């Protein structure tokens, strides 16, 4: 069976390393699907869920807050400042952070504050969506 090696790495630690049949993730220009022997590619990724289909058919989910994707024919590497295993996502914490980002957006006093709040809100909304997707698959 054809597989591709997948590494998902955050600034703090390696989140996932293993063999997979398929990887799906949110590219900057749309959803990307990576199979073994994919053409080499480097691109930015948006906040969202990385779905890793294992060789046995099971799935692993990882939330990433954006980052960089590198694809080689036999290897996929996802680099993200923040990456959280689907099983470790905390709905209460994510909702609280989303509310704080919405409040920061309302109270932004400069364009920098506004951009920072918008970015944080987008990340938290993507994390909540990833959490819902993970719960549906369980």
Curated annotation (Swiss-Prot):
It is a peripheral membrane protein. InterPro entries: ATP_F1_dsu/esu_C_sf, ATP_synth_F1_dsu/esu, ATP_synth_F1_dsu/esu_N, ATP_synth_F1_esu_C, ATPsynth_dsu/esu_N. Signal peptide: none annotated. One of its GO terms (cellular component) is plasma membrane. The keyword Membrane applies. NCBIfam families: ATP_synt_epsi (TIGR01216), PRK00571.1-4 (NF001847). HAMAP family: ATP_synth_epsil_bac (MF_00530). This is ATP synthase epsilon chain. The gene is atpC.
């Amino acid at each position: 069976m054809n597989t591709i090696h997948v590494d998902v790495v955050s600034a703090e630690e390696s989140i996932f390393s293993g063999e997979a049949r398929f990887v799906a993730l949110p590219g900057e220009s749309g959803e990307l699907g990576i199979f073994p022997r994919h053409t080499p590619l480097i691109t930015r990724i948006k906040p969202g869920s990385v779905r890793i289909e294992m060789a046995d058919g099971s799935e692993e989910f990882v939330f990433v807050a954006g980052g960089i994707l590198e694809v080689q024919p036999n290897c996929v590497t996802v680099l993200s400042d923040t990456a959280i295993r689907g099983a470790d996502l905390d709905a209460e914490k994510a909702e609280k952070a989303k509310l704080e980002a919405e409040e920061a957006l309302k109270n932004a006093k400069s364009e920098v504050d506004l951009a920072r709040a918008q970015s944080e809100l987008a990340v938290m909304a993507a994390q909540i969506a990833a959490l819902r997707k993970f719960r549906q698959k369980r």
